[in-house]
């Protein structure tokens, strides 16, 4: 997404565009090599920065800026890349929104594949899940096995909002409930048997509002009205403004988003592999 933004900027600018990228010591999670290729391709004035474990010292400061519990670990690199970028410019463009407009997340594949998994009989699903639970997990939540287990767990649900919730959650509903005090639970009201978890209800509104769309666009719409504004945009807004940097997201232009949602889901998610196919 950022690469497309850079390409557009380079095509409109008479001088080299300034680009900024942040990476990690661990190559598996670093996008710096790709960023360098894009910078070379478009002849940008490129700046790189690497986040190390020692830089977690800034966490108390970040907690102050966010002012409430915030669980996205990328708040840390977002803060640092904003700080480094502000040393050179006052306004920067980013690629936020591209994944939600054009189906860029792996979970969209998983949700689509889960509909095929629905054909597997329930008893067989339970046998498969029971066997998978005995397999050891490494590097969770990043290992392939951990993701496979999450997929199998989501297959238990037929309710699309609960399945979507299972795809994006890192803790179980039981563990989450265990964090609440009795007073908090009383304030929330007792949940009736068979009732959706509160988080699943929240996601269900997105799917219900997008009933006229195909399944892929229903997923995208749900993320556009939940994950995008309440996680990604919050993260970038606070991380950038904490460093007096104005961050702008071209993919969030309302006319572009309206155009994206007039496109059929198959233009974005082709089969089970071609994500962001139209791009």
Locations of regions flagged by a protein language model:
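Globin-like tetrapyrrole-binding proteins
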Residues: 228
